[in-house]
Design a protein with these regions (language model features):
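Solvent-exposed loop/turn segments at secondary-structure junctions
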Residues: 50-53, 90-95, 117-122, 139-142, ...
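Active-site-adjacent mobile loop/cap segments within catalytic or ligand-binding domains
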Residues: 121, 133-135, 164-224
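Signal-peptide-cleaved, periplasmic/extracellular N-terminal interaction regions immediately downstream
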Residues: 1-43
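Flexible glycine-/small-residue-rich
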Residues: 7-9, 27-29, 48-50, 115-117, ...
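Sec-exported extracytoplasmic/periplasmic mature domains
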Residues: 72-83, 105-109, 140, 149-158, ...
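Soluble non-cytosolic domains of exported or imported proteins
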Residues: 61-69, 94-98, 138-143, 195-206
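Active-site histidine-acidic residue metal-binding/catalytic motifs
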Residues: 27-103, 107-111, 121-124, 128-130, ...
Length: 224
């Protein structure tokens, strides 16, 4: 069965509920954007990727450690801009993938950004297949993915592996635009070494914040 629904304005997100044989759908409108600072007053969910599991670099750097460091820097940068930041984790304890999206939805977040570091399976050459990738799933998240991807390319100075639509658990939430960033390849020795440094972690974090700024600034202009 397929439903076609006509809307009076753009849909920012949606939520579908089926309860006692009753189907209902909530449609979310774009947030009101502050013209002087497009991030001020928003709620952003920051998801430092993993644990459990997670990739490990050549010298043993475990992905959840630098992703948390980057996530905490993103939190601090956003908080300084007047953003209400919701973290899916602030320590090394594992958090279920589906719970991460639930945390963002319960907080009524305006966006969800999941922070990761990439790796390749055995048999693939990382020297010819590495760089920065940004994933989204639902169409309403694509503009956020593209804005953040461009900002990450500027900050991290790595090859462009593109913006890709993929059905990943953490970016399936429909209530807000959700993206997953694979900023660098932890399996590359130089990138693993860079991700150990506060300076490069700061650059990763700044790329995310700059991407959010560009996205919400454009959204505010489009919906003004």
């Amino acid at each position: 069965m397929r439903y076609n629904i006509s809307l009076r304005g753009p849909a920012y997100g949606f939520q579908v509920v089926w309860h006692d044989s009753v189907f209902s759908m909530r449609v979310r409108r774009p947030p009101t954007i502050d013209a002087t600072d497009p991030l001020k007053g928003l709620t952003i969910a920051v998801d430092p990727g993993h644990p459990p599991i997670g990739a490990t670099g050549p010298t043993g750097l475990w992905e959840p450690i630098p992703t948390l460091a980057v996530g905490l820097k993103v939190r601090d940068m956003l908080a300084a801009r007047g953003v209400n930041v919701v973290m899916t984790r602030t320590d090394s304890l594992p958090v279920d993938l589906n719970l991460r999206g639930t945390i963002a939805r319960r907080a009524n977040a305006n966006a969800l950004v999941s922070i990761h570091l990439n790796a390749l399976p055995d048999g693939q050459n990382p020297y010819t297949n590495q760089g920065t990738t940004t994933f989204y799933f639902y169409p309403q998240a694509e503009p956020l993915a593209r804005a953040t991807h461009q900002a990450l390319l500027t900050q991290l100075s790595l090859p462009d592996k593109g913006v890709i639509r993929r059905n990943l658990a953490v970016i399936r939430p429909t209530w807000m635009p959700s993206i997953l960033c694979e900023g660098a390849f932890i399996m590359m020795p130089d990138q693993e070494a860079a991700m150990r440094t506060p300076e490069y972690q700061e650059r990763y974090a700044k790329g995310i914040v700059d991407g959010l700024d560009a996205y919400f600034r454009a959204l505010g202009q489009a919906t003004h």
